[in-house]
From Swiss-Prot:
Component of the mitochondrial ribosome small subunit (28S) which comprises a 12S rRNA and about 30 distinct proteins. InterPro entries: MRPS18B, Ribosomal_bS18, Ribosomal_bS18_sf. It comes from the Eukaryota. One of its GO terms (cellular component) is mitochondrial small ribosomal subunit. It comes from Mus musculus (Mouse). This is Small ribosomal subunit protein mS40. One of its GO terms (molecular function) is structural constituent of ribosome. Residues 218-254 are annotated as: Disordered. Keywords: Mitochondrion, Phosphoprotein, Ribonucleoprotein, Ribosomal protein, Transit peptide. The gene is Mrps18b. Belongs to the bacterial ribosomal protein bS18 family. Mitochondrion-specific ribosomal protein mS40 subfamily. It is found in: Mitochondrion.
């Protein structure tokens, strides 16, 4: 009697465990949803030089931190392997959160890229060639590099940032008339001799055999034979219309 009872209890144990497992509620349903990220306060500090960013580069705090070196001089990129990627990260700040090892501009919240901040822009332009340094060389992210490029171009257009214009001395050979394409084109030899430019422009005597064939063909309609054209057309006397009108009444009166 004890054996069948124990066997029945062993059959009921998996059923009870299965029912308790189905009744379990996941922990995610019990968690409350946090406030949206838009309503969350920004963790970034507020910069006092946002309206006038050029004053920060003249402050004592800037000189104590960077000295006379550029802001990207002591920056080292953090990447995997020994060969750095050819492009830097897209941006260092996402959803008001700063990534690890931010770029030289994103790590200092008092640095602002502005076309009026000439001292900051000069640090990203080569002093000898005027070429803007590439992003992998300075280490700035691609978002800040795009802002730097636009600010440098606008500063050059406004005359705030000087740039190099190469001076090229013109060569005398470029303005000479020695070249054949620049000199006067000589006339054709046929024009100097008085002959026409094309041979079919002058009179060509047709062969006698062809003339005899045409005479037989057009024997009933041929009135007279045409010879070669005259060398020059006869010149007609040209008189002004006023003189001719004056002479006519005079001749009638005479």
């Amino acid at each position: 009697m004890a054996a069948p009872l124990r066997h029945t209890l062993l059959k009921l144990v998996p059923t009870l465990l299965r029912s308790s497992y189905v009744a379990q509620v996941p922990l995610q349903t019990l968690c409350t949803r946090g406030p949206p990220e838009e309503d969350a306060p920004s963790s970034l500090p507020v910069s006092p030089y946002e309206s006038e960013p050029w004053k920060y580069l003249d402050s004592e705090e800037y000189h104590n931190r960077y000295g006379s070196r550029p802001v990207w001089a002591d920056y080292r990129r953090n990447h995997k392997g020994g060969v750095p990627p050819q492009r830097t990260r897209k941006t260092c700040i996402r959803n008001n959160k700063v990534a690890g090892n931010p770029c030289p501009i994103c790590r200092d919240h008092k640095l602002h890229v502005d076309f009026r901040n000439v001292k900051l822009l000069e640090q990203f332009v080569c002093a000898h060639t005027g070429i803007i340094f590439h992003a992998p060389y300075t280490g700035v992210c691609m978002k800040q590099h795009k802002k730097l490029t636009q600010a440098i171009q606008k500063a050059r257009e406004c005359g705030l940032l000087s740039y190099y214009v190469p001076q090229v001395e013109p060569r005398d050979a470029d303005f000479g008339t020695v070249h054949g394409a620049v000199s006067v084109t000589p006339p054709a030899p046929t024009l100097l001799s008085g002959e026409p430019w094309y041979p079919w422009y002058s009179w060509q005597q047709p062969p006698e055999r062809e003339l005899s064939r045409l005479r037989r063909l057009y024997q009933g309609n041929l009135l007279e034979e045409s010879g070669p054209p005259p060398e020059s057309m006869p010149e007609m006397p040209t008189t002004p219309p006023a003189e001719s009108s004056i002479e006519q009444p005079g001749s009638q009166s005479a």
